[in-house]
């Protein structure tokens, strides 16, 4: 992987920019944090060199000035809304976030239940949070939000919300997912702070789209691909162009809501500190791109991955044709097709020649390895073992796992643990078997030592894999795509 992003520069410039914005507002800033604070793998894929936890590392630079406020929509608690990438509900993810922030030495000041309307589940959750020692505040639905500004900026609007007690100059407002009410929470606090005679400010931190690179730069197009299901569209910020004569990039939702936000700022404090939605941001990512071509190529690969992801989601019954069509248009803008992903053709050709599911992986040196289905191993398991052998310098003819090891595990799974008679071992089972073999087998031990070197490699499967196998690829850091079809015709799949 060719590095295209200066992560050290980013940590310094980003924290400095936030400090500068705090001082601009007299020492109190509410910072709305969009996107992922932890494990931002999208950013690390399109900006090679960006560390997935860069944002939290940057916040740790400000730990003495910052406190965290986590907001959650009470309706999402009631509906048991699930975070798709983690498979856990928003209310559980909030607890995970509290632990993660605390473990990183950051202070979690409180939790806010937004759109609180006496929902039974929200009341029970509030009780649970308080029992865990967390401060909890309630914010209520406001009729006519966000357009009825006289109502919103009044005692019947923001005025009826609880005032969140904060003690530090930087208040980071974050949430388990979108639609949680981060911006409304910030604005409510500005209203209450102003009533108390405190001059507080608002700013927004979002990594994408990157405001100071071209509209159709692959990095920005990759963001559109990632949000294809949300109908987010990157656009030139018309307010910034009018105010400064400069072309900057923002996205439709921020541009659409800016006149309303501006009017709210004026109503709350008499004037607005911002002339454009771009002004509100503090993102410094664009200034830390060190190799534009490397980031552009990485982003094109991300768009292809998102294309396959969208097609597989449609096949599973979760996605839409509209999202697929949108990503196809983005691919045309970048002049790329699925064939620009080398592992795709290799996996599909192997599947066609063998008549069974196959998989392929592109190694760091460009070598393409494949795996085919056999009586004992599935294609993805065979591929993983082949990749480990390649990395460890073990001859391809060597069997890392003897059939004498695999066969009894298969027998136990199929005949004693209720497995399907035709089911093969999953990747996690293969890795457990390999780890056991490594105790007495030198080659298996060498292979195990290479697991970390799989991170960042590209793989493709000719069929949709079982969820457990997809999960193992993800945990190993391998970027997997699949053809949008299943092996076999059964309806129930694990």
Protein language model annotation of sequence segments:
Residues 392-399, 411-418:
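ATP-dependent carboxylate/acyl-activation modules
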Residues 1-173, 189-350, 356, 363-365, ...:
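Flexible phosphate-sensing "switch/lid" loops adjacent to ATP/NTP-binding sites
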Residues 185:
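Hydrophobic positions on the alpha1 helix immediately C-terminal to the Walker A/P-loop
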Residues 177-178:
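The conserved Walker
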Residues 372-373:
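Short clusters of small/polar residues that mark proteolytic maturation junctions
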Residues 203-204, 399-406:
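Beta-strand segments within the central parallel beta-sheet cores of soluble alpha/beta enzyme folds
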Residues 376-392:
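A short, polar/charged loop-to-alpha-helix boundary motif
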């Amino acid at each position: 992987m060719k590095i295209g992003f200066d992560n050290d520069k980013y940590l310094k410039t980003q924290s400095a920019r936030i400090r500068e914005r705090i001082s601009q507002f007299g020492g109190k800033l509410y910072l709305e944090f969009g996107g992922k604070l932890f494990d931002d793998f999208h950013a690390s894929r399109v900006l090679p060199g960006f560390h997935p936890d860069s944002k939290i590392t940057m916040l740790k630079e400000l730990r003495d000035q910052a406190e965290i406020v986590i907001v959650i929509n009470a309706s999402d608690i009631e509906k048991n809304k699930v975070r798709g990438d983690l498979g856990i509900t928003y209310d559980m993810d909030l607890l995970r976030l509290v632990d993660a922030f605390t473990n990183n030495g950051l202070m979690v000041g409180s939790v806010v239940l937004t759109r609180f309307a006496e929902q039974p589940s929200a009341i029970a959750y509030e009780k649970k949070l308080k029992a865990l020692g967390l401060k909890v505040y309630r914010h209520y639905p406001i009729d006519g939000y966000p357009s009825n500004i006289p109502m919103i900026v009044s005692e019947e609007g923001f005025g009826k919300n609880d005032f969140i007690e904060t003690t530090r100059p930087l208040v980071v407002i974050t949430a388990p997912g979108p639609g949680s009410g981060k911006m409304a929470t910030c604005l409510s606090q500005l209203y209450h702070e102003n009533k108390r005679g405190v001059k507080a400010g608002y700013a927004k931190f979002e990594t994408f789209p990157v405001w100071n690179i071209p509209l159709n730069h692959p990095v920005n197009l990759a963001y559109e691909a990632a949000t294809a299901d949300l109908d987010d569209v990157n656009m030139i910020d018309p307010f910034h162009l009018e105010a400064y004569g400069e072309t900057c990039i923002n996205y439709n939702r921020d541009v659409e809501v800016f006149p309303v936000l501006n009017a709210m700022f004026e109503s709350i404090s008499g004037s607005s500190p911002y002339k454009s939605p771009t002004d509100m941001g503090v993102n410094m990512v664009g200034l830390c791109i060190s190799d534009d071509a490397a980031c552009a190529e990485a982003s094109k690969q991300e768009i292809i991955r998102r294309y396959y992801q969208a097609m597989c989601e449609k096949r599973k019954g979760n996605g839409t044709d509209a999202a697929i069509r949108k990503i196809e248009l983005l691919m045309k803008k970048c002049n790329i097709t699925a064939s620009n992903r080398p592992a795709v053709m290799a996996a599909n050709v192997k599947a066609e020649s063998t008549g069974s599911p196959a998989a392929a992986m592109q190694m760091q040196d460009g070598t393409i390895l494949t795996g085919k289905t056999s009586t004992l191993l599935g294609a993805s398991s065979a591929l993983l073992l082949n990749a480990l052998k390649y990395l460890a310098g073990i001859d391809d003819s060597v069997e890392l796992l003897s059939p004498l090891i695999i066969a009894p595990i298969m027998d136990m799974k199929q005949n004693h643990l209720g497995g399907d008679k035709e089911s093969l071992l999953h990747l996690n089972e293969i890795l457990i078997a390999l780890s056991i073999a490594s105790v007495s087998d030198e080659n298996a031990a060498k292979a195990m030592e290479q697991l970390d070197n799989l991170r960042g490699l590209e793989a493709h499967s000719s069929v949709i894999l079982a969820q457990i196998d997809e999960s193992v690829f993800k945990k190993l850091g391998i970027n997997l795509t699949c053809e949008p079809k299943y092996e076999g015709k059964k309806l129930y799949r694990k």
